[in-house]
Amino acid sequence: IKYFNKNKSSRLPLVKIEDSPRFSYRGFMLDISRHFYPKDKIIEVLDILSLLKLNYFELRLTDDEGWRIEIPGLPELTTVGANRGYTVNERDKLIPAYGSGAHGTKNGNGYLSKKDFKEILVYANNLGIKVIP
């Protein structure tokens, strides 16, 4: 139907659509601990989940491969845990993993601020999607 809205010359026949989900739990998991995606990409994912009528979104924020959420009072979690590159002792960043490269490129680096995470939660809730961090 979205396609037809963009194409003004298209018409739909008069129909009645009855639709209901077969399963009560319809979910998707995005693991940003292993490969970071910024807030705008997560919002795009939520829009797609809404179109597909999924109602649960597991957002993996932490694991051995990365820490992706700001925690006030513990800045070292993001200053070290949200960055990858060559390191001897992992005091300033984590070892390269999952395509991030050994030279400290920005690929795979980053974290969600407290504000970003709240905006994601509100946006998902408005779409009827429950976020499981």
Residue ranges, per PLM feature:
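Feature activates predominantly on carbohydrate-active enzymes
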Residues: 1-133
